Amino acid sequence: QSTIAKRKIMRTQTQPLGYYDRELTKQQRDLKEVFDFMKPRADHTDINQWPDSTSFREVMIRFFDASSTVAERTLALLYRAITRLQIDSAELPAGDPRTSTVRLNYYPLSDPLSTAEQTTTPSLGAQALGQHTDPGVLTLLLQDDTGGLQTYSLKNGWVDIQPSPGSIVVNLGDAMQVWTNDTYKAALHRVRPVHKKARFSTPYFFNPGNDAVLKPLTQLSDGPAVYQSFKWRDYIKARV
């Protein structure tokens, strides 16, 4: 779609969903365009901003529902591995599709902002997407064959996550790091700039419920707690 069409559904300070082309990571602008949406509420209230395409909306909602199912199954398997089948995963904290989001990422070859717009926004960072961890429970990522995604390893430094057809990359988030008391760390990752062709990726961010409390859980870790208790609602507000 044209820039004009995309900016009709531009994110604002009061509307965090929709299109955006000046995302910041650690105060540096990322070289990407995004479209964020959530599942419409049970009362059919839709807080999303959608482009003028009914079929697009329908496909995205089906994708969201399928991603929620995969995320729930992935978390259950992760809990089984951590607790070695000693605890029913139903007794452990869950993610909540009502607070989760899908993002469509587009990494262009050049800056999507005009020269004039570039003068009034933060400068581009060295990466297409600066290094960061995701705040939630876990992230499911679909990526095309372009490459560029890297994750940080204490042993090997930055490691390329090579695209593999039909695969889903799973990143653990900050919530899981807290629940496991640092036994499992949130994945520090970034995206390198693309040079030959644009890159597309689609993450599903599986987040705790709004009223969820984040604290180390004895069922998932040993030793003294390294985090104090705090609410997800407060944490995500501080991250924005």
Task: Report each predicted region and the residues it spans.
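Peripheral, non-catalytic segments flanking oxidoreductase cores
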Residues: 1-240
